[in-house]
C-alpha cells in the first residue's frame, strides 16, 4: 500500500529513534562478524583425518583386550587431565597483579604541592603477625581466644594476631568466601546487659554506613560464642602506622612538614565523620596507617555520637580532658588532632608511658622556637577550654596549610601562594620609601622624617575577606565598589531587614566602612556594642586592633592583634600588624636607633643565616628572667628588648613566606640596622625580586644603609659600586651619590684609606672627595625646582670645594 511517507524524498525523512542493540547484526545476510572463540595454546591447529572417526576418536574395536588401555592413553594425550587453559591464564594474571603490587616506588605530592610524601613499603599480611606470648607474660594480658587455623562463622580462617587493643586481640584472617582475601577481625563492645547490647547494635549500624576512602572499610559483623560482642570484619590495610613510621626514623620524630601533610590527609576522614554526627574519639599515631598511596584511619571501635554518654573509649595522653564530664564533641576530636601532631614532631614528656598534658614551650623546645606558628596552632588545638579550640576541621585545615607554607619557606626557601588565606593581599606598602625620601631634602630643601605612622600602617594592612557562607556576603560584595557613604547607608538598611539579622559580616562591614571614612571614634563605639555578641570572633579582635592603632593606643592594639594570631596562627596579616605595632611602640619610646638584642639573637631572629633553634636556651631563659618574653612567647610584652625581638622575627617570617609583601622586607632591614647588622639588612633588601616595582627603591635603600653612620671603607666602596650599576637617569641618582661621597669624607677624616682606588671618578682622598662632592652638588643644583634652594646648593658646593689658586 502506498503512503504519503513512502512518496517523500528519502533525504527529507524525519529524524526518529530506533532501538540500538550493539549485539544485533546490521543485516541478516551480512558477512560473519567478530566473535569470541576459545583459545587453547595446547590444541593442535588442524585435526588429522587419518585413522580417526568423525568424533576425533580412533576405532580400537579390532584391538581386542588392548582397546580399553589405548583409549585411556588417548585421553591423557588429548589433555583430559590438564588444567583448563582459561583458568590457568586468569591465575597467572592474578599472581602477576599481586607480585607487582608496590613495585612502583613513587612518592606522592600532597598539600597543594608543598610536600612530597616518601615511599612506604607495603606490609605483607604474614609480616604483620606477632607472637602474643611476650604481651601475655610481661603485661598480664589474657591470651588470644582464637588460634591459627580456627574458623569463625564458617568463613574466616584465623592466621594469627597483629595487635592488642581496647577491645582485646585483633586477628588476621582469610576470607574463604572471597578468594582468600585477607581481613582483620576486631572485637565489638560487650553485650553483657541490655544497655550494652543496644549500644553494640547502634555501633554496628553506623559503622556499616561509613563509606570514605580515608576510613578502613567494614565488610561484615559476625557473632561468635568465644568472643562476647562478636567481631567487626574490616579490610586489611598493608602499611605501617604513623607511630611505627615515626619510630623508624633516626631522630624518633617526623619532619614537621611530613607530619603536617599526613594530618592533612587524615582530616577529610574525620570531617566526614563529623558531618555524619559522630566523632572518632581515639585519634593517635597507632590508628593512622600509611600505605603506598594513601593514609587511612583504622580502629572504629571508639566512634560515638556527638554528645554521647556512657563508656567513651579513648587513649590517655591524647583524649581531651573534658570528655569524661562533657562528653565527646568536635572540639574533643580537634584536641586529639593537636596531640597526635605534637607527638609526631617533638618528644613529649611521659609519665609511666602516658604523655603528659600540655606542650613544651619555645624556650624548652628548639623546634617550636624555629616554627612558632606551629607551636601556636598546637596550643590552640590543645587548649584546655574547648571553646577556644578550632571550631571545625575546615578551619583547622586552612591554618595547617598556612603553617606548612611558613615551614617550607623558612627551612627550604620555597614559597607558595596563600590559597586558603582569610585575608586579602597587602593593599599598599608602608615604610618602603622613608629612608630614600629623606635625601629628597637635597632637591627641594624640605626636611622629611624616616618614621612610620599609624595611618600608613593601617592603610597597608590586609583586610579580612568576606565569608562566602555568611547570609550577607552577596550584599557586601555587591556594595564593595560603591563610595563608603553609600556603602554605610546600604549596610544600615540591611541591618533593619530580618533577612540579615543573623549576619556576622554586615556589622563588621559597618566598622570597616567607618574606618575608611575616617570615623575612628565612631568605629570604636560600634565595636564596643558588638563585644557581647562577637567578642570571641577573630574579626572583632582584628578591627579592634586597627581602631586602637589609629587612636595611638599601641599597647591595646598589640593585645588585639595577638588574639588574632592565637586564633589564626597560619595567617601573615596579624604577624605583619604585630611587627608594625611593635615598631611604633619602639619609635614612641625613642628606641628606633638603639641596639637592644643579644649578639646571637638578631641574626637568628632574621632567619637569613641562622635559626632560632640554634640559639642556646640560656639566651631565652635570660630574656624571660628580664621580662622580655615568657614561656609561651606571648606577643603582649612591652619590654623594648622583647618588642625588637618579636618585630624582627615577625617581619622576617612574613617576608620569607610572602615575597610580595615588600613592607616586611623594609621593616626587617630597619630592625637589623638598629642592631648594627648592616650586611643582613642588605641581604633582606636584596631579596626584593627584580620584577617588583619596589626593586629600585630597595636598591637605593640598601646603598643608604651601607653608608649609614659608622660606615666602613668596604661598605662605602660597595655602595659606590652598587650606585654605578643604577642608570644615571634615575631621578635620585645625584642625591644618593652625594650621600655616598659624604660618607667617604666622614670616614677619611677619622681613618686612613687602605687603598688609593678612586671612589666613583674621584680620588679616595679628602681633597679628591671634597672636589667630587662640590661637583655633584652643583649638578644637583641644576635640577633644583626652586631658585632659592638652587642658590643654597651652590653655596654649599663652594663651602666644601677645596681651596685652589684659580
Each predicted region: which residue ranges?
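Conserved N-lobe ATP-binding subsite of Hanks-type protein kinase domains
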Residues: 169
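Conserved short submotifs of the Hanks-type protein kinase catalytic core
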Residues: 226-241
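AlphaC helix of the eukaryotic protein kinase fold
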Residues: 189-209
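Activation segment signature within eukaryotic-like protein kinase domains
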Residues: 262-263
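A short, aromatic-enriched beta-strand patch in the conserved N-lobe beta-sheet
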Residues: 220-222
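Conserved N-lobe loop of protein kinases adjacent to the ATP-binding glycine-rich P-loop
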Residues: 164, 174-182
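Catalytic-loop of the protein kinase fold
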Residues: 274-290
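Regulatory extensions appended to serine/threonine kinase catalytic cores
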Residues: 410-510
Amino acid at each position: 500500500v502506498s503512503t504519503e511517507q513512502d512518496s517523500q524524498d528519502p533525504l527529507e525523512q524525519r529524524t526518529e529513534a530506533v532501538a540500538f542493540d550493539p549485539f544485533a547484526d546490521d543485516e541478516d545476510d551480512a558477512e560473519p562478524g567478530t566473535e569470541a572463540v576459545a583459545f587453547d595454546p595446547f590444541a593442535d591447529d588442524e585435526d588429522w583425518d587419518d585413522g580417526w572417526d568423525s568424533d576425533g576418536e580412533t576405532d580400537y574395536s579390532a584391538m581386542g583386550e588392548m582397546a580399553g588401555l589405548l583409549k585411556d592413553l588417548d585421553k591423557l594425550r588429548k589433555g583430559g587431565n590438564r588444567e583448563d587453559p582459561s583458568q590457568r591464564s586468569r591465575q597467572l594474571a592474578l599472581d602477576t597483579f599481586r607480585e607487582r603490587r608496590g613495585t612502583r616506588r613513587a612518592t606522592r605530592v600532597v598539600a597543594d604541592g608543598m610536600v612530597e610524601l616518601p615511599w612506604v613499603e607495603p606490609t605483607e599480611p604474614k609480616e604483620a603477625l606477632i607472637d602474643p606470648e611476650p604481651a601475655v607474660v610481661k603485661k598480664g594480658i589474657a591470651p588470644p581466644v582464637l588460634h591459627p587455623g580456627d574458623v569463625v562463622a564458617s568463613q574466616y580462617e584465623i592466621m594469627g594476631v597483629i595487635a592488642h587493643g581496647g577491645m582485646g586481640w585483633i586477628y588476621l584472617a582469610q576470607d574463604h568466601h572471597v578468594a582468600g582475601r585477607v581481613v582483620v577481625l576486631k572485637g565489638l563492645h560487650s553485650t553483657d546487659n541490655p544497655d550494652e547490647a543496644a549500644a553494640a547494635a547502634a555501633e554496628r549500624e553506623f559503622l556499616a554506613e561509613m563509606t570514605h576512602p580515608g576510613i578502613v572499610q567494614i565488610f561484615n559483623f559476625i557473632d561468635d560464642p568465644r568472643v562476647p560482642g562478636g567481631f567487626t570484619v574490616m579490610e586489611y590495610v598493608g602499611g605501617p602506622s604513623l607511630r611505627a613510621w615515626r619510630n623508624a626514623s633516626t631522630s624518633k620524630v617526623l619532619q614537621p612538614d611530613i607530619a603536617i601533610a599526613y594530618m592533612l590527609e587524615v582530616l577529610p576522614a574525620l570531617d566526614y565523620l563529623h558531618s555524619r554526627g559522630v566523632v572518632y574519639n581515639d585519634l593517635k599515631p597507632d590508628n593512622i596507617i600509611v600505605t603506598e598511596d594513601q593514609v587511612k584511619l583504622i580502629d572504629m571501635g571508639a566512634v560515638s555520637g556527638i554528645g554521647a554518654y556512657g563508656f567513651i573509649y579513648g587513649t590517655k595522653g591524647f583524649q581531651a580532658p573534658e570528655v569524661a564530664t562533657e562528653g565527646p564533641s568536635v572540639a574533643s576530636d580537634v584536641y586529639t588532632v593537636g596531640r597526635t601532631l605534637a607527638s609526631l614532631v617533638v618528644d613529649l614528656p611521659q609519665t609511666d608511658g602516658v604523655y603528659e598534658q600540655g606542650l613544651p614551650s619555645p624556650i624548652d623546645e628548639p623546634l617550636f622556637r624555629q616554627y612558632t606558628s606551629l607551636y601556636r596552632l598546637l596550643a590552640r588545638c590543645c587548649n584546655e577550654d574547648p571553646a577556644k579550640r578550632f571550631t571545625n576541621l575546615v578551619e583547622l585545615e586552612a591554618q595547617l596549610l598556612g603553617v606548612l607554607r611558613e615551614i617550607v619557606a623558612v627551612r627550604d626557601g620555597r614559597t607558595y601562594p596563600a590559597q586558603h588565606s582569610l585575608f586579602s593581599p597587602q593593599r599598599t606598602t608602608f615604610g618602603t620609601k622613608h629612608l630614600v625620601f629623606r635625601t629628597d631634602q637635597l632637591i627641594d630643601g624640605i626636611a622629611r622624617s624616616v618614621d612610620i605612622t599609624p595611618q600608613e600602617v593601617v592603610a597597608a594592612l590586609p583586610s579580612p575577606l568576606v565569608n562566602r557562607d555568611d547570609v550577607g556576603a552577596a550584599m557586601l560584595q555587591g556594595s564593595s565598589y560603591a563610595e563608603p557613604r553609600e556603602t554605610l547607608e546600604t549596610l544600615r538598611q540591611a541591618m533593619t531587614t530580618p533577612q540579615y539579622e543573623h549576619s556576622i559580616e554586615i556589622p563588621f562591614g559597618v566598622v570597616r566602612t567607618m574606618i575608611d571614612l575616617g570615623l575612628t571614634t565612631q568605629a570604636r563605639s560600634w565595636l564596643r556594642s558588638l563585644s557581647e555578641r562577637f567578642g570571641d570572633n577573630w574579626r572583632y579582635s582584628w578591627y579592634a586592633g586597627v581602631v586602637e592603632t589609629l587612636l595611638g593606643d599601641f599597647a591595646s592594639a598589640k593585645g588585639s592583634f595577638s588574639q588574632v594570631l592565637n586564633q589564626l596562627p597560619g595567617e601573615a596579616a596579624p604577624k605583619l600588624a604585630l611587627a608594625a605595632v611593635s615598631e611604633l611602640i619602639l619609635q614612641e619610646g625613642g628606641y628606633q636607633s638603639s641596639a637592644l638584642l643579644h649578639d646571637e639573637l638578631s641574626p637568628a631572629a632574621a632567619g637569613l643565616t641562622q635559626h632560632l633553634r640554634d640559639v642556646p636556651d640560656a639566651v631565652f631563659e635570660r630574656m624571660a628572667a628580664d621580662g622580655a618574653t615568657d614561656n609561651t612567647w606571648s606577643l603582649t610584652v612591652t619590654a623594648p628588648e622583647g618588642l625588637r625581638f618579636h618585630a624582627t622575627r615577625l617581619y622576617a617570617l612574613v617576608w620569607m613566606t610572602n615575597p610580595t609583601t615588600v613592607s616586611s622586607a623594609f621593616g626587617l632591614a630597619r630592625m637589623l640596622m638598629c642592631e648594627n647588622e648592616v650586611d643582613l639588612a642588605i641581604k633582606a633588601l636584596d631579596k626584593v625580586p627584580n620584577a617588583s616595582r619596589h626593586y629600585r627603591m630597595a636598591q637605593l635603600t640598601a646603598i643608604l644603609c651601607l653608608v649609614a653612620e659608622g660606615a666602613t671603607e668596604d661598605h662605602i666602596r660597595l655602595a659606590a659600586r652598587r650606585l654605578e650599576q643604577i642608570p644615571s637617569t634615575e631621578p635620585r641618582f645625584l642625591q644618593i651619590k652625594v650621600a655616598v661621597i659624604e660618607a667617604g669624607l666622614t670616614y677619611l677624616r677619622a681613618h686612613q684609606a687602605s687603598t688609593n682606588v678612586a671612589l666613583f671618578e674621584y680620588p679616595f682622598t679628602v681633597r679628591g672627595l671634597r672636589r667630587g662632592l662640590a661637583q655633584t652638588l652643583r649638578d644637583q643644583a641644576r635640577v633644583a625646582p626652586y631658585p632659592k634652594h638652587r642658590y643654597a646648593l651652590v653655596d654649599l658646593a663652594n663651602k666644601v670645594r677645596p681651596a685652589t689658586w684659580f
